A protein has these predicted regions:
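Extracellular carbohydrate-recognition regions
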Residues: 70-107, 272
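Trp-centered recognition loops
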Residues: 30-39, 71, 85, 138-140, ...
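Secretory/extracellular carbohydrate-interaction modules
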Residues: 121-186, 256
């Protein structure tokens, strides 16, 4: 706060685009002639979409209403680990041009990506992928609710570092699931038997902790998605990558070889 500025308190804030609700951090009284550092831990809340963040200055009593306020801002950034859920019934189709449409919160590499009846659909001729999140997420768990519809290469991705680097959990042919590594092309790290069926709902949980990956997949019986009281068999995959592991990255969804999958939600949380 410059010496010539009026008295003011200051706080950081974020705004949810969907509800319009504003969350603010602790208010700090500004000292004239001094740089001060503020921090704000954004709370976890379901279904929110942060579309704005910034600084709020509250002028104090005694400051003339007509006085021009001056405050200096050196840096403003957001970082940290994820703690939120994407429910696709709340996402929207963004129309960029008449022919160019994208799904909110996602970056599409390739494939037919669209929303239908509250779910995200991804299909392809050769391959399709879409990503969300930050490149610098480190240790986290991502839980995907997905339904394979056609084909034998329906996948979810973690530690995504772009189109040529990521890990994936895949529903494959011959009643198998596998953990894959994308090194400008996918290869199988480990696999196991799992009698998955097209048209059924599955919960895929992937924990990335350092160089170790732990994945679980189980069928979600009809009517049990909200209660999570599941009695279905669970398949487990574990692998520690000692060959140039990917230690950070976003999350995503992907299909290959003409496959088509739909996704109901993605839940991300840090492993602290």
């Amino acid at each position: 706060l410059p010496e010539y500025a009026g008295e003011a308190d200051c706080s950081l804030y974020v705004r949810d685009l969907r509800s319009g609700k504003i969350f603010t951090g602790k208010s700090v009284h500004l000292k004239k002639g001094c740089w001060q550092e503020l921090s704000f831990r954004i709370p976890s809340w379901e279904g929110a979409l942060i579309g704005e963040m910034g600084v709020c200055f509250d002028l104090l009593m005694g400051t003339e209403a007509t006085q021009t306020f001056a405050g200096l801002l050196d840096d403003l950034w957001a970082d940290g680990t994820p703690d939120y859920r994407i429910d696709f019934c709340q996402e929207t189709t963004e129309v960029w041009t008449g022919l160019h449409k994208e799904v909110s919160q996602f970056t599409r590499l390739k494939g037919h990506l669209y929303l239908d009846q509250g779910a995200l659909h991804l299909s392809c001729a050769d391959f399709g992928e879409a990503y969300t999140g930050r490149y610098d997420w480190k240790d986290y768990t991502a839980v995907f609710e997905m339904t394979p519809l056609t084909g034998e290469n329906n996948m979810v991705n973690v530690r995504v570092q772009g189109a040529i680097r990521s890990y994936a959990v895949a529903l494959l042919a011959d009643s198998k699931i596998a953990l894959l590594k994308n090194e400008n092309g996918y290869r199988v790290l480990t696999d196991t038997a799992f009698d998955w069926k097209a048209g059924r709902d599955y919960e895929v949980s992937v924990c990335a902790q350092g160089a170790r990956l732990h994945a679980e997949i189980k069928e979600v019986p009809v009517g049990c998605r909200q209660t999570q009281q599941l009695q279905a068999d669970t398949a487990v995959l574990e692998y520690e990558d000692t060959d140039h592991p990917y230690l950070q990255g976003a999350v995503g969804v992907s299909v290959r070889n003409g496959s088509h999958a739909k996704y109901s939600s993605i839940r991300m949380r840090c492993n602290s």
